[in-house]
Every structure is written in structure tokens, then in C-alpha cells.
């Protein structure tokens, strides 16, 4: 197989969110397969020396906090999977149903807290920052649990459940209302057989900008949509400068994020995967640590004996 070729930022900025790589890059993301190491001692040697650490996180790290992933067997809301509802077409066809789905997800987060994995990442960022070392999190998650745990250097490439975007004026705003609008109160039950609320569009969340009143949508990246070029430029810079990369709780099947860690590995930077199972990318990385992230990450990111702690 051909080695992975670094995908230039001008290409990455044009990529869209999806479950398969764009045709133009499918032949660029293959690496020679090798068995990854599970030696924590060896990983810790790299960790002790790293000055710029990138952590790429996915749904697995939040699943340990009880956040529904809508992936795999049982990953349904009513009779739909996320990819059935998280699309521009679904919103255009039935905005009430899509808003019920996202209202349910927002309300669920009210009872969820960061787990040991989130906390280990945030603590590591704070500790290493005092040593002049950089830790940045690139997350595909939209639940804000990294932020809640205290992570500051955070790139939320798929947006946030708690931001809205007006379909008329384009204004993006934080929104932590519960419920987000009166008509959604008590709606969004996930059980199969639950009937759609069929809320009139004028009663769905509306823009509060003066003179607008347009329909709001969740400020998240839906399947088939382009990712924000500005955020992806930041991602590209972080990947280009990191000297250690961790891939945490991600299935490595959603693009373009699935390309990020292989890009880094292609230039010889050690990459460590932390997951409850192997993924299509496992053999492209130097390390693989199998198990719950809340168990493996605290050990991996703990203060090293060679660190100078102020």
C-alpha cells in the first residue's frame, strides 16, 4: 500500500462530514500495517518529552458518562439513527422531528457529568501549561463535557448542542435554555412507537435578533455539510506542530476527523489510540490501549516523575 500523504489544508477545508472518506483522499490514507504496542511505560517516555500534545476525542469518551452515542446496535432514537436525522434534508423536510431529537439530547446532558477521562485530559492541560507545554483537544463531540471538565484549548469541530444558528440571518448564539422553547417542553421521548409532536414551525426555536425571528437550527455539523474552514485551519496547524497525538474514544470512521491521526503518524509522530476495541486505524498507530478511557487515560496522563511541578 502507498504511504499516507499529508492532505494540505486547502483540501481539508473543503471536506464534509461523513462516514466515508471523500473519493479524492481514499487512496491517501493507507499506512503499512504494524502491530501497535500496549506498553504504557514506553508511551510514558514519549509523554515525558512531548511539548505539544494533540488529543483527538470521539463519542466513546462521552459514552462513559452515559451520553447516548446513537451508534451501532441499539443506537436509535425512536426508529431513526442519527444519520437519518442529522442532515439538512431531514431538517428541511421535518424541522419539528429534528428539533425533538436535539431537544432530547440537550435535556439528557443536564444529568451528565465529565468522567475520569475528561478530567484527566483537563488536569493534564493545566499542569503541562504551567511547564510551557501545550495540550489541545480536537473533539468530534457536541456535548461540551470537555469544556465542563475544564479544558480550555478546545476545538469543537462538529459544533455544540448548546449553540444555535439562525437559518435567516446566520447569527450563532449560545443557548442553554431548558426547554429551548415552550413547545418542546416534555417532547423528544426516544422510545420506539412515540408519535412525532408535529410542532408548527412558527412555534419551534426562533431567532431573538431584532427584526429577525427566523427559524433556528442546532449549530452542529450535519452529515454532508462542510466543516468550518477556520476551525479546520486551526486543526491543521495543531496537527502540523504536535509531537505526540492521542486518539481517544473515536471509531475512526467519520471523516474528515478519521484522517487527522493518520496524518500525524505519517510524519513519524507517535500516536496512541485509547479505545474499548480496535478500530480500522489501530494498526496505523504506535500504541493501542484497550479499555475504558476513564481507566486508561488517568494513568497515561498522570504527572511523570521527570516533570517539574510548580
From Swiss-Prot:
Q: In which tissues is it expressed?
A: Widely expressed.
Q: What class of enzyme is it?
A: transferase
- Identify the species of origin: Homo sapiens (Human)
User: Which spans of this chain does the record mark as coiled coil?
Assistant: none
Give the UniProt keywords, A-Z.
Cytoplasm, Metal-binding, Mitochondrion, NAD, Nucleus, Transferase, Transit peptide, Zinc
PROSITE patterns, from UniProt?
SIRTUIN
**What is a single molecular function from GO for this protein?**
protein-succinyllysine desuccinylase activity
Gene symbol of the encoding locus: SIRT5
**Source organism's superkingdom?**
Eukaryota
* Stated family: Belongs to the sirtuin family. Class III subfamily.
List residues of the Deacetylase sirtuin-type domain.
Answer: 37-307
The text the record gives for the protein's domains is: In contrast to class I sirtuins, class III sirtuins have only weak deacetylase activity. Difference in substrate specificity is probably due to a larger hydrophobic pocket with 2 residues (Tyr-102 and Arg-105) that bind to malonylated and succinylated substrates and define the specificity.
KW Nucleus (keyword) present:
yes
Residues that bind Zn(2+), according to the entry? 166, 169, 207, 212
Q: How does it assemble?
A: Interacts with CPS1. Interacts with PCCA. Monomer. Homodimer. Forms homodimers upon suramin binding.
E.C. number(s) listed in UniProt: 2.3.1.-
Q: Which GO terms describe its cellular component?
A: cytosol; mitochondrial inner membrane; mitochondrial intermembrane space; mitochondrial matrix; mitochondrion; nucleus
For this entry, the protein name equals NAD-dependent protein deacylase sirtuin-5, mitochondrial
Q: What happens after mutating residue 105 to M?
A: Increases the KM for desuccinylation. Does not affect deacetylase activity
Query: A single GO BP annotation from the record?
Result: response to nutrient levels
Please list the cofactors this protein needs.
Zn(2+)
